[in-house]
Amino acid sequence: MRAVLSQKTTPLPRYLWPGHLSGPRRLTWSWCSDHRTPTCRELGSPHPTPCTGPARGWPRRGGGPCGFTSAGHVLCGYPLCLLSGPIQGCGTGLGDSSMAFLSRTSPVAAASFQSRQEARGSILLQSCQLPPQWLSTEAWTGEWKQPHGGALTSRSPGPVAPQRPCHLKGWQHRPTQHNAACKQGQAAAQTPPRPGPPSAPPPPPKEGHQEGLVELPASFRELLTFFCTNATIHGAIRLVCSRGNRLKTTSWGLLSLGALVALCWQLGLLFERHWHRPVLMAVSVHSERKLLPLVTLCDGNPRRPSPVLRHLELLDEFARENIDSLYNVNLSKGRAALSATVPRHEPPFHLDREIRLQRLSHSGSRVRVGFRLCNSTGGDCFYRGYTSGVAAVQDWYHFHYVDILALLPAAWEDSHGSQDGHFVLSCSYDGLDCQARQFRTFHHPTYGSCYTVDGVWTAQRPGITHGVGLVLRVEQQPHLPLLSTLAGIRVMVHGRNHTPFLGHHSFSVRPGTEATISIREDEVHRLGSPYGHCTAGGEGVEVELLHNTSYTRQACLVSCFQQLMVETCSCGYYLHPLPAGAEYCSSARHPAWGHCFYRLYQDLETHRLPCTSRCPRPCRESAFKLSTGTSRWPSAKSAGWTLATLGEQGLPHQSHRQRSSLAKINIVYQELNYRSVEEAPVYSVPQLLSAMGSLCSLWFGASVLSLLELLELLLDASALTLVLGGRRLRRAWFSWPRASPASGASSIKPEASQMPPPAGGTSDDPEPSGPHLPRVMLPGVLAGVSAEESWAGPQPLETLDT
């Protein structure tokens, strides 16, 4: 590399280290108070040279006291040289380097550069006068090489002996020894400390460039360029490689932006569907032996309880009056027979005759019939109306009937068989007779005597011959004709340990027929939160079940309604179990309970009560699908011997020839296969990730690692923002104006330990120790060198060509 000559006069560098100039007059120098003007004095003399102003140098081309210097300076009457080539001075601390002298009378400055390509100036570090003994003035040609061994060699003839330089470390910690070394012909120099706080030490010496653990780009442009060049996202590199073509760059930028908008839109739709938690119904078929479910059978003919026979007679009389007034029908027959069976001791009873049947309105050809219910004060009344007169009469009669049953003692129980015979005439399973222990009996106030077939039977094969066969007696003499108009058998199939709610899930079998009930079982598995609202065995349900059975939603709804009625009406409905400490509703104790009950029941039907939300479905339950086929039984040809045979088994004598007094029911499994219906989420976590990956791959060809690259870009951008912001704040802090000192004094005040000796001071020591370099922010530019370049670390030693 050839030296580049400066074409302008430059000021003396302010970071020149104060020290000794060993020469004819043994001079020493220091800075004046402005830190721009040097002052010199002879050792032992108290009179320094005056501070007349900054010393300046002059440019020279080839020759002169410095030979090939780019700029010359005069210090204390001696010419001082600034070299513009990549020469490392002794003692710089920037690596093993050598010192070069141009003559015996010219001190030399060592120069350091950031790189060979950017060597645009020089840095003056330290000057020593005497050259090494092996170098003569006549031997100098101006061309020097740096050999591999680290010592300087000359192209001029003659022997050359290497000499080890002195280093910066010795200058910093042992300034006296360093000055002595320079007197022996070795020069030491040091690069100025890096700008920063005064307490920050200079960077440690390094050999060459070493990559740090974490390195950031210099600017956001460089960061974005690196990302677009190396990212695995498709289309990103087009934003960089097409920079020379603005049309392509703009087009690819718009395409990338459009793809990003489309990706965000589709991801939004995907997450919206996922947050709604949709489910799939997965149906699978399994084949295994199954236990037969329970079957409850009721005769549909409730009995008249003996303690309230008189009350029921009064109710029948009141009902006949209402029907006569509405439809002109005479129902007075049978009153004497009922009066004869009235017991002497009866509970107190009050029949509310204000609640009577009446015509409400005419809607064209349809007549509405109903009754009015009012609260205890009579200020709030409403009509419960029906378009069917039969339904109106039955509901009105049922209301008064339940009001009377509430007067029964809590320990009262009715017999479950009729006096004329048994309800179940025969029972068999798979050709074997049933046992009495396989039946459970109870009395229902509305559906009469009921039997639950509770045999532990496992279905071996499908078909009628492998199921349960029952022959039942159908009683045609109703005890409460206004309460039930049914002539037949009430049947309900339900799971084990479940309460049969006959008013909701039962069906009827008419007399004189054979009904075959085929069962198909479905197992339902529901998902809990967050996909649905279900409970496992009643866990987490706020409602306390009043039935001593397993959890079902219907049992929970009934219990919830009864508890709300006790809280609202101060009494409970008779057809449901009571909570602890409550009593049933009756007009004798609660005159307006009917108004409260029907209001609450209407809210339950319209889902305005909280019972629906309080009673979730079971997460796992068995649902029975029933299909029924009927035929006439017994047939005309077999009726004689069939009825005669059944007469010996308990059929009443007067019913021997009456087909309408019998019914046959077969309960079988339609098939042993059962269906399992399981809910599954539409978007599980793996499916959601798969859908997201498909969309990212469709629009950008990206993967999870591509997303990590984006995350890395965001982290780098955040770190770079903090670094640049910190630099700007530090620059603003150090450039903030300080308080102006006294006139003629410098605003730069080094530390006391680093101040040079005063200009007028005297010392008898012939070799005073040199002070430390003041840690101040000084310009790093001489002949075009930037401040960042002047503080840069060393590069590998290069050869200077002049």
Curated annotation (Swiss-Prot):
Not specifically expressed in epithelial cells. The chain crosses the membrane at residues 251-271, 695-715. Residues 192-205 have a biased composition (Pro residues). It is a multi-pass membrane protein. Residues 145-211, 738-777 are annotated as: Disordered. GO terms for molecular function: ligand-gated sodium channel activity; sodium channel activity. The keyword S-adenosyl-L-methionine does not apply. Its main location: membrane. InterPro entries: ENaC, ENaC_chordates, ENaC_CS. It comes from the Eukaryota. Keywords: Cell membrane, Glycoprotein, Ion channel, Ion transport, Membrane, Sodium, Sodium channel, Sodium transport, Transmembrane, Transmembrane helix, Transport. It catalyses: Na(+)(in) = Na(+)(out). GO terms for cellular component: actin cytoskeleton; apical plasma membrane; membrane; plasma membrane; sodium channel complex. Residues 1-250, 716-802 are cytoplasmic. Originally identified and characterized by its inhibition by the diuretic drug amiloride. GO terms for biological process: cellular response to acidic pH; cellular response to aldosterone; cellular response to vasopressin; intracellular sodium ion homeostasis; regulation of blood pressure; sensory perception of salty taste; sensory perception of sour taste; sodium ion import across plasma membrane. Pfam families: ASC. Residues 272-694 are extracellular. Glycans are attached at N330, N548. The additional delta/SCNN1D subunit exists only in some organisms. Belongs to the amiloride-sensitive sodium channel (TC 1.A.6) family. SCNN1D subfamily. Potential alternative pore-forming subunit of the epithelial sodium channel (ENaC), capable of replacing the alpha/SCNN1A subunit, creating a more active channel with distinct properties. ENaC functions in epithelial tissues, where it facilitates the electrodiffusion of sodium ions from the extracellular fluid through the apical membrane of cells, with water following osmotically, regulating sodium balance and fluid homeostasis. This subunit could also function independently as a sodium channel or assemble into other tissue-specific heterotrimeric sodium channels. Can form an alternative heterotrimeric epithelial sodium channel (ENaC), composed of a delta (SCNN1D), beta (SCNN1B), and gamma (SCNN1G) subunit, where the delta (SCNN1D) subunit replaces the alpha (SCNN1A) subunit. This is Epithelial sodium channel subunit delta. It comes from Homo sapiens. The gene is SCNN1D.
